[in-house]
A protein has these predicted regions:
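Oxidoreductase cofactor-interface core, primarily capturing Rossmann-like NAD(P)-dependent enzymes
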Residues: 1-2, 8-115, 127-130, 148-149
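A hydrophobic C-terminal alpha-helical subdomain
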Residues: 120-186
Length: 186
């Protein structure tokens, strides 16, 4: 029997929640058991949902930075493929990221503009969000900081090499998530 662990992309080592993933990976490697590690990129759905609407335009703290976003369905497909043939994938670490997407590109897909806000303003808005759990503002600030400074745009062929179909359109997925998050006024 082998174990498959869904971890965090290698490009995510600067994220505040990366150490827990890397420590778990090490424990798995040291266990003596058969293993495969799927280092998942951040979701296109999350990227789009993190864009904030201000009237008819979107805002973010991402600046010109890109995220090598991946569709959650593609990650699920890869996990099923790996689980279907664990011996073939034993001892492997796959970095499952997609193509780089920017907030500006998502805004363009939506037919609207994008405005960059400062990281301090972004943190303030997160802290003022009443439904967030205590860990969420620092986690999301960490993601925004890493995207803004170019740490999460690295690509890899692993996702497409493992999929039995073309990777889903992450720009369209991010735009759909941003559109779904748009406030509706009656």
């Amino acid at each position: 029997m082998g174990y498959t662990y869904t971890s965090l992309t290698g490009a995510g080592d600067h994220l505040g929640f990366a150490p827990a993933h890397r420590a778990t990976e090490q424990l798995i490697r040291d266990s003596g058991l058969s293993w495969t590690i799927l280092r998942n990129g951040l979701y296109a759905e999350l990227f789009g949902a993190l864009l904030m609407w201000d009237g008819d335009a979107v805002e973010s703290a991402f600046g010109p930075g890109a995220l090598a976003a991946v569709a959650r369905e593609d990650l699920a497909d890869v996990a099923a493929i790996v689980a279907g043939d664990p011996a073939r994938h034993a001892g492997r670490v796959y970095d499952l990221v997609g193509v780089p997407v920017t907030a500006q590109a998502v805004a363009g897909q939506l037919g609207t503009g994008h405005r960059t806000i400062g990281l301090g303003e972004y943190r303030r808005r997160l802290l003022d969000t009443p439904d967030f759990l205590p860990f969420q503002p620092p986690m999301l600030s960490s993601i925004a900081t890493n995207i803004r400074h170019g740490f999460l745009g690295a690509t890899s062929a692993d996702l497409q090499d493992l999929l039995d179909h073309p990777a889903r359109d992450v720009l369209a997925i991010a735009a759909a998530a941003a559109s779904a998050a748009r406030p509706q006024f009656s």
